[in-house]
Amino acid sequence: MRAMFRTPRMPQRKTAAILVIGDEILKGTTRDTNSHFLCKRLHKLGVNIRKISVIGDDISEISREVQSASGAYDYVITSGGVGPTHDDKTYLGLAHAFTDQMQFSDEIRQAVNRFLPTYTAKKRAEGVGEGLEEAVRLATEKLCTIPKMSQLLWGTQKINGSLSTFPVVRISNVVALPGVPKFCERAFDELQDQLFPIEERQSLCFETLYTDLDEFDFSKKLTDLAAQFEDRNVQIGSYPELKNKFFKTKLTIETESSETMEAVVTSLRELLAGHIVYYDSHAWLDIVTKWKAFKKRKASENQIEFIQKLNEAESIVEEIVEKYPLEQIALSFNGGKDCTVLLHLLRLKVDEKYGPSTPIQGFHIMVEDQFPEATQFIIDAAKFYNIQVLEFPGPLKTGLAALKKTRPSIIPVLMGSRATDPNGKYMKTPVEWTDSDWPQVLRVCPILNWTYTDVWHMLRGLCVPYCKLYDQGYTSLGGRDNTVKHPALRIVSSDGREHYLPAYKLHNDAEERCNRSNI
C-alpha cells in the first residue's frame, strides 16, 4: 500500500518525461539505472517528473513517444540509442518526430577525431587489422549523422571547468543522452547548469519523517491532516517499508514554503507522537554529532535516568581512550547486542580524539556451533566501524590468554558485560583487573549497570546496526546448540502460522536469557 496526498494547488513546477530507449532493457538483458539516476537529480532540481517510458529500438515508436512527450512536458530526456551501431535509432526517431532530415555533423566528427587515434592504435595492438579502417569509417558516419535542426550542447567538466569532450544533441525541448550509465551520468552532470540554470529552478522544501506505525494505523488521520493544508501547496507521500528493522512507514513532505513545511511537520509529529523514528541508515558516520543530538532528544523527553547511564558509559570509555594509546586497547566483540553498544561508544570516542579513519582493535572469542548470522554480522560491523577483529578459541580465559600472546601490549579490554550477566554479577565496579590466576587485563564494562531495555533503547534510538537474529525471536546469543527463540516472543496467527516478535519487544528484562539452555 502507498498513498499520496496532493493538494489542488501544488506549484506549477517544470515537468519532465524520461524515455529509456533500447531493446536490451525490454528483454531484461540490461538493467536500467539511468531513469533512477535522472529522477533523483531532476527531483533535487525542483523538476516534476511526470512520466517514464521504456521503448524499443524502433523509429516509429521513438517518434510517437517523443512527439507525445514533447508536447505534454517542459523537458524530455532520452537515454540510449545514440551509439555507432545499426540498432542505435534515437536520432532517426527524433528526426521523424520533428519532420526533419538527417545530416553529417563536422562538429561531432572533430570530437570523434580526438579519441580515434587512441582507439585504432589499441585495436591494432590487439591484433585487429583487417577491416578496421572500414569499420571505423562506418561507425564514425553513424555517430556523426544527426537531425538537421539539432543543437549541440557542450557541457562543463566538473574537474577542471573545461568543455566536455563530446556533445549532446538537443532538438526543441528534447535532450538525447547516452545509454551507458557512466556516460549518461557524466553528460547530465556536465549539462545540469546549462539545462537548468540556478536562477530558473523552482525552490522547494523537502522533509522526510519515519514512524514505527503501519500505514493502517494512521491513514484516516493523515487524510484529514492533508485536507487541512489543501490550500497551502503541500504534497505528502506515505510509503510502507516491509524489511526495515527500524521503521515501518516513510513520510515525505514537499512544499514551496518553509513556513508551511514547519506547520505540516509539526502537525505530523503531533499525529505520530511517541512513534517517530529518527532513522539513520549509516549510524557509524558523523557519530559525534549524532550522539549529541540523541542525548538532546532524550533530555527533551525527560529521560533523566537513561541519560545518566549514557553519560556514565561515555565517561568510562573516554577515560580509557585518554589514558591508553589505541594499540593497548581492545574490544571484545562477538556480535551480540551488548558489545555492539560498546563498539558504538568506542567508535564515538576514537572519532572524537583521532578521527573516523583511525582503526579500532578488537577480538572475538568463538563459541562452538556459532550462528553463521552472527559471524556475518561481525564481518559487516568490522567494515562499518573500522575495527580489526582477531579470532581466538574459547572459553573466555583461554581466549584472553591467546589475545595477550598475540598482542602482549593490550591492557584495557572493553566488554559488554552487565550486572545481570552470569559473570557480570561478580564485578563490583565497571573497571577491574582480572583475578590473579587469569591473563592480566583491565576489564572495562561501561554498561555494567544497564538493563536489557537500556541496551535496546540505545541501539534502536541511534539506529545502530545489530545482528539480524535479534529480529527473529532471539534475545540472547550463544551457540546454535544451546540457543533457541524466546518462547515469550512467540505468536500464532489466525491461520495457525508461527511467528516471533523481535528481541526489543520482550517486556520482562529478567527473562532475557530464558532462551539459553546453559545459563
UniProtKB/Swiss-Prot annotation:
It catalyses: FMN + ATP + H(+) = FAD + diphosphate. GO terms for molecular function: ATP binding; FMN adenylyltransferase activity. It holds the Pfam family MoCF_biosynth. It is an enzyme of class 2 (transferase). Pathway: Cofactor biosynthesis; FAD biosynthesis; FAD from FMN: step 1/1. Residues 328-485 are annotated as: FAD synthase. Its EC number is 2.7.7.2. Keywords: ATP-binding, FAD, Flavoprotein, FMN, Nucleotide-binding, Nucleotidyltransferase, Transferase. Its cofactor is Mg(2+). GO terms for biological process: FAD biosynthetic process. Catalyzes the adenylation of flavin mononucleotide (FMN) to form flavin adenine dinucleotide (FAD) coenzyme. This is Probable FAD synthase. It comes from Caenorhabditis elegans. The lineage of its organism: Eukaryota, Metazoa, Ecdysozoa, Nematoda, Chromadorea.
